[in-house]
Amino acid sequence: SLTFRMIPYADPRSGLKRLRDGFALDWGVLGIGEPVARALRQEVKGLRVFPGLAGPACSVPSTQQGLWCFLRGQNRGILFDLTERIRSLLGEAFVLDDAMDTFFYADGRDLSGYEDGTENPCDGAAHDAAVVRAEDGLMGSSFVAVQRWEHDLERFRSYSSDQRDAIMGRRAETNVEIEDAPASAHVKRSAQESYVPPAFMVRRSMPWQTAHQQGLEFIAYVESLDRFERVLRRMIGADDGIVDGLFTFSRPVTGGYYWCPPISGTRLNFSSLGI
């Protein structure tokens, strides 16, 4: 996962044109942040800056950048080469601000040991949740919310298995949802079908680790950022003062919103950016 910031007063057009023409679709996913659209004096309807939020004894930071990439590769050598290629395409108007390698853990589990993304929509429902259907240059595009969460696994492991299950609202061993889980359980705070209208998202959580920290990179693809934001506000207790149990051992340290442009033929379509 890469984020790039724009150099103040730099013109991003030439770099974005090279990126449009040179970004191979099998490299991964590309997202454009509101600062880039603003610099181009273009409006991408529905795109906005990630909000910094606060709730009872918890907070959600905004670290909005100009561009985000989620690259795929079988090894770090491939990812290194792709990163260098993107930096070369972007040129001097963008600077790599952050890079985090993520990985697949224990059959798709979070580092806490619990399965994640269990209730992702599938097939047509996934398309409806994540893909914009507007009759303009946005058709076929998507919006994405990206957060990095940092876990305190030592604290989490100090809880009993029942306490850990109550935080998540699921049994770790069976992944079965606990019917009488507390209102603060993550499955209850984030139940996408409980919103009006429903807030279904196509979510992906990828573990990460450095020498002294670890956690998950949370990625949610949506046809409208309102879907993600409604869930996030409930998680911090903005609706009823009840904070998601995740905050007992984890906290978000980054947050950004991005627009993933549609595809025309074999390349990205930047027409909504005037490019």
Name these PLM-found stretches.
Residues 1-275:
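Long, histidine/aromatic-enriched segments associated with O2/redox biology
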